[in-house]
Each structure stands twice: as structure tokens, then as C-alpha cells.
Amino acid sequence: MNHMKRNFEHVKRIVIKIGTSSLVLPSGKIDLNKIDQLAFVISNLMNRELDVILVSSGAMGFGLDILKMDKRPAEVARQQAVSSVGQVAMMSLYSQIFSHYQTNVSQILLTRDVVEFPESLENVTNTFETLLSMRIVPIVNENDAISVDEMDHTTKFGDNDRLSALVANITNSDLLIMLSDIDGLFDKNPTIYDNAVLRENVTEITEEILKSAGGAGSKFGTGGMMSKIKSAQIIFDCDRQMILMNGANPRDILRALDGKMIGTLFAKE
């Protein structure tokens, strides 16, 4: 392993992305303890005068829980309806728990056309800057209720892994921390191979890495390892850094920022 020292003293603005699999228990119930830990960590970072943006999946998972559905509906309209119910519940819970730490949050729902159209991009960028200047944590998700994925009018990002990388770029963030249900990027699938080795540092996306990144997302989410690798490429392309790490204990974010070798660091040499 390459034990390259990690130093994040330059980091002033962070995007944290949490996936559905980190927010929803295997039973389908919401992991309230996880959300509380995440709120504590983000509030702690805000108190250190860092800017923090949270990209949160979970609207579908919350919606399935509230509506007592055991699986994602097949029809797109029903998927969007369930997500719209879940988004309200998710933001309500975030607002309630962050308030325990005297931290205010806001909601920003994005579609791809907003980011690709210069005037709306400028508006949303100004909104991010204003919220952060007011010491408010923007909580970002794709606007699932209205996003479409058709050839003549594509408004979907694909998944929130890609969305988080784009948000890191448009907000000039120094670091993207991607929380997942795995410890980082391995040389092969750790759920199949016991001898899989964690890659502590990745300086470029190689063909070997692309080959080892197959597989789909969880039953509650959409993002598999390939989507994380593609997001890392966006991060490389805009000269930023990314940590892919396990979201089981959000307090590990603080340890990672202190330089501990947690997860996989994607950073150019």
C-alpha cells in the first residue's frame, strides 16, 4: 500500500455525499442514529468555520418507509410520487436534528438542465454562496419528482454520486467526501474476494480501475462502484479531491480530515 501522507489544511469548503444505503437500515427503516451523527459532524465542521454542503440521497427510501412499501415501484410516475413524499419527510427530519446542534439547513433540489443552462447555473451558484455566507448548510438532492431521462429532454443527473461531483465543481469546493456502504475502492470486489486489498490512494482512473468497478447499487439506491469512479473522474477533471469511505460511522469524517488513512483518497500527485 502507498501510505502517502494526507494533509487537508488547505480545505475550506467540503461537499459530503451520503447514499441511501447509509441512511436506511436493512429493514427499510430510517437510521436515526446515523442522521444524528452526521448532523453533529457537519455542525462541528461549520463551527470550525468550514463551509459544508450535504448531498443527500434517501427520498425514495424515506418514501417507501412512510408509505409502508417494501420495494421500489416499477412505474416511473409512482417512483416520482414516492420520492416526493420521502423528500418532505427527509428534510423535516434533517431540519429537526440539525436544530439540536444550532445549525440551520436549507433545501436545494436540482435538475441537470439547471446546471447546464448558464443563467440558471449562475442563480443556483449565487444561492449556494449566499446560504454558506449565512452559515446555513445547503442540503442538495435531485428533483426526482420532475426529472426525466428522455433523449430530447434529459434533466436527470443519473445518480447522486455524479450530482455530488458536479456540486463540488460549481461551488468551488476543495474536497468531496463520499459516504457509502463500503470502505473505499478495492483492487477487486471485497464482497466476493476475501483477499481484496483497499486502495488507499488513487492518482488517476486507469483501465484496471474501471474493470474492477463493476456492479450495481443497493436495493434502496442506484449508485454502484462504477458511478463513484465516474464521479472521481469529474473530480480529477476539475482539479479537486475526493475521499470514498464507509458511512457507517460519520464521525470518521473528522478523523479523515485530521489525516487518518480512512477510505480511498482520489487526488492527483
From Swiss-Prot:
Keywords for this protein: Amino-acid biosynthesis, ATP-binding, Cytoplasm, Kinase, Nucleotide-binding, Proline biosynthesis, Transferase
This protein's record includes keyword Transport: no
Enzyme Commission code: 2.7.2.11
SUPFAM superfamilies documented for this protein: Carbamate kinase-like
Protein name (record): Glutamate 5-kinase
Enzyme class: transferase
One MF annotation (Gene Ontology) recorded for this entry: glutamate 5-kinase activity
InterPro entries given in the database record: AceGlu_kinase-like_sf, Asp/Glu/Uridylate_kinase, G5K_ProB, Glu/AcGlu_kinase, Glu_5kinase, Glu_5kinase/COase_Synthase, Glutamate_5-kinase_CS
Pathway: Amino-acid biosynthesis; L-proline biosynthesis; L-glutamate 5-semialdehyde from L-glutamate: step 1/2
Main subcellular location of this protein, as a coarse class: cytoplasm
Sequence positions that bind substrate: S57, D144, N160
Gene Ontology CC terms, in alphabetical order: cytosol
Residues that coordinate or bind ATP: K17, S180, D181, T222, G223, G224, M225, M226, S227, K228
UniProt cross-references to Gene3D superfamilies, sorted A to Z: Acetylglutamate kinase-like
Gene that this polypeptide is encoded by: proB
Function field: Catalyzes the transfer of a phosphate group to glutamate to form L-glutamate 5-phosphate.
HAMAP family: ProB
Biological-process GO terms, alphabetical: L-proline biosynthetic process
Compartments, as annotated in UniProt: Cytoplasm
One Pfam family of this chain: AA_kinase
Catalytic activity field: L-glutamate + ATP = L-glutamyl 5-phosphate + ADP
Family indicated by similarity: Belongs to the glutamate 5-kinase family.
